[in-house]
C-alpha cells in the first residue's frame, strides 16, 4: 500500500489506473479504524481492481461544542490495518490540503434531507459532510464509493448529492457492522466508560422492539416514539431523537408509508451514539 498526502499525488495514481482500465473503489473515513471500516474496505476490494481509503478528520462537519479536538487520530495503526485489509492507496491530507482557501468559501448543501434527524440538532453538519465528500470524489474519481448504513441519513444525502450533481460514481451502502451484543461499531465507542459500554447495546435493543411493534400492527408512530424515548431516558440515555421516518424522504412517517427507517441518536455521558433499523410494512387496507 502506498500513502499520499497531496491531491496531486492521488491524481497521479488515479490517472495511471484509468490508463490501464482499472476500476477504482473508494472508502472515505475519519480514521481510528475499527472492524466496521475494514468491512467497507473489503467490500470495495470485491467490487474494484484498486481500493483507495481516505483518512481525514473533517473540521467543517463538527459543531463548536462537538468533539473535533478529541476525535482519535491513530494514523500509524490505521495504515497497518489497511495494509492487512488489502487497500492500495491511503490518502491522508492535511486540513490545508483539503481547504486551500480556508473553510468558509464554497459549500455543497443538500436541502430537505438534511433538515431531519441529525440535521435538526447538528446545524451545518451535513453541509460539511457533502462539501468534503464532493471534494474527495473529485480528487479520487472512483467508480464505486462505499459507505456504512449506520449513518443512514448521510448515505441518503450523499446519494442525492451524486444524483443531482451528476457524479459518475456508484454509491454503495454496506450493512451496519455490529459487536456481538448488537452495538453498532463506531470510533466514538472508545469514549464510553465501562458502565456506559455495558448499557450501550440497549440502543439497538430498543430499535428492535420498535420494529417488532410496527410489524405487529402499531401505527401510532408518534406515540411509539414517545414511549421509546422515555424508556431510553429512564435506562440512562439522553435522547436527542428517535424517529420513525419515510426511508426515502426521511420525514416523519405516516400510516400509509411502507418503507421505513427507525433512527435514533442519544448520548451516554458525553458520547453521542446513533443507530437505525429499516423495515417494510404492508399498508393497512
From Swiss-Prot:
ATP binds at residues 30-37, 148-151, 185-188. Keywords: ATP-binding, Cytoplasm, Ligase, Nucleotide-binding, Pantothenate biosynthesis. Its EC number is 6.3.2.1. GO terms for molecular function: ATP binding; pantoate-beta-alanine ligase activity. Pathway: Cofactor biosynthesis; (R)-pantothenate biosynthesis; (R)-pantothenate from (R)-pantoate and beta-alanine: step 1/1. Its main location: cytoplasm. Beta-alanine binds at residue 61. Gene3D superfamilies: HUPs, Pantoate-beta-alanine ligase, C-terminal domain. One of its GO terms (cellular component) is cytosol. Belongs to the pantothenate synthetase family. This is Pantothenate synthetase. It comes from Alcanivorax borkumensis (strain ATCC 700651 / DSM 11573 / NCIMB 13689 / SK2).
